[in-house]
Amino acid sequence: MAKTLTIDEMHELLEELETNYHLMHSDELPELDLYMDQVVTYLWDQIGGLTRRPGEDKILTKTMINNYTKAGLLNPPDKKKYNNDHLVSLIYIYMFKNFLSISDVKAVLDPVREACFTEEEREGKAPKKGEEEKKAPLEFTKVYDVIRDSLSRGKKELEKNISEEIDSAAETFEDADPSLRPMLQQFAAVCRISADIYMKKLFLERLIDASSDSYSTTDT
């Protein structure tokens, strides 16, 4: 039988999530480049707490990394080694792919990647002999740090919003049978939070479409 959580237990679940939520600053990333197995282990250790079932769910596999590279989401490794730009890319991909399709993830990352990496870097090609080495206008890890710091500042507000949704759910079904009230209030919390997630996801999808060169609102 499914377990119903009380309002207090839902707040405790949120507090547990708050404790596990941490995105490392670029200064915390490894000083040395890593092989693929090391990348998988490192990200498991660093962001494993952000999975649905910490300690059980996989962050990524070697097959996933290869597929992301083939899809143009990840720069090819240098002599089978991955640097901090690769790690940051994988963090973005992991977070986005939970609610966006891979094609949408690519659409989101492509403009940033083009500003942070030269074409040679994105394709894993060495500069031609005698040709001056090109440099991208932005540094990928610095962009990440700005985003990461912004998320950290907004974390409390996000937590507060979820907490308020739980409290609002606690005010519903006050006249219901006491034996059914916790289940109904949990359902109300799920519906309220789901509606919020749905609207944000829909906005993201429409934002991506509106920003895509291939998207058109013209009827065919």
Task: Please state what every model-predicted region is.
Residues 2-115:
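Basic helix-turn-helix/winged-helix DNA-binding cores
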Residues 108-111, 115-220:
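Intrinsically disordered, low-complexity, charge-dense segments enriched in Lys/Arg
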